[in-house]
Swiss-Prot record:
Domain of life according to the entry: Bacteria
Disulphides: none
Pfam families documented for this protein: RNase_T (PF00929)
Protein name as annotated: Oligoribonuclease
HAMAP family, per database record: Oligoribonuclease
Keywords tagged on the record: Cytoplasm, Exonuclease, Hydrolase, Nuclease
Length: 181
């Protein structure tokens, strides 16, 4: 294992909602691939403690989804703060990618980055300013070649590591079926 500036950092957050001014991070996971999307390492998947008062602000969809997955129970039992989760994630990433080299990779990753900027600024700063957002290809495929969308189905567990693995697989699918190389 050595840090390589061509490796890609994939990240997913689960949050109590979509508004970083009101909602908080409740789970973070990262993995690293090489430039060809081969998974090199999975980082820690961390349930981030939030207060009962914060969890009570979740809307019906988030309560149903995160209770059903067991995440709410893991968050309540966790003793890991956002800051500690941030530092553990950076420690993992330093082994694989130098700071400032990898774009932030994932699905609808701009939303995750908004939360990182507010609650995990050191981690947000670890990424290059660019984005590798798989949802961009999905939106283009929906408009330009909608028939290929049926070829990739997500499980949609809304568990951070599962979601990242699906994002990597989805990009590999688009590389094979949508992008002409």
């Amino acid at each position: 294992m050595s840090a390589n500036e061509n490796n890609l950092i994939w990240i997913d957050l689960e949050m109590t909602g979509l508004d970083p001014e009101r909602d908080r991070i409740i789970e973070i996971a990262t993995l690293v691939t090489d430039a060809n999307l081969n998974i090199l390492a999975e980082g820690p998947t961390i349930a981030v403690h939030q207060s009962d008062a914060q969890l009570a602000l979740m809307d019906e969809w988030n309560v149903r989804t995160h209770t059903g997955s067991g995440l709410v129970d893991r968050v309540k039992a966790s003793t890991v703060s956002e800051h500690d989760a941030e530092l553990a994630t950076i420690d993992f990433l330093k082994q694989w990618v130098p700071a400032g080299k990898s774009p932030i990779c994932g699905n609808s990753i701009g939303q995750d980055r908004r939360f990182l900027f507010k609650y995990m600024p050191q981690l947000e700063a670890y990424f290059h300013y660019r984005y590798l957002d798989v949802s961009t290809l999905k939106e283009l495929a929906r408009r330009w070649k909608p028939e290929i969308l049926d070829g990739f189905k997500k499980q949609g567990t809304h568990q951070a590591m599962d979601d990242i693995r699906e994002s990597v697989a989805e990009l590999a699918y688009y590389r094979e079926h949508f992008i002409k190389l």
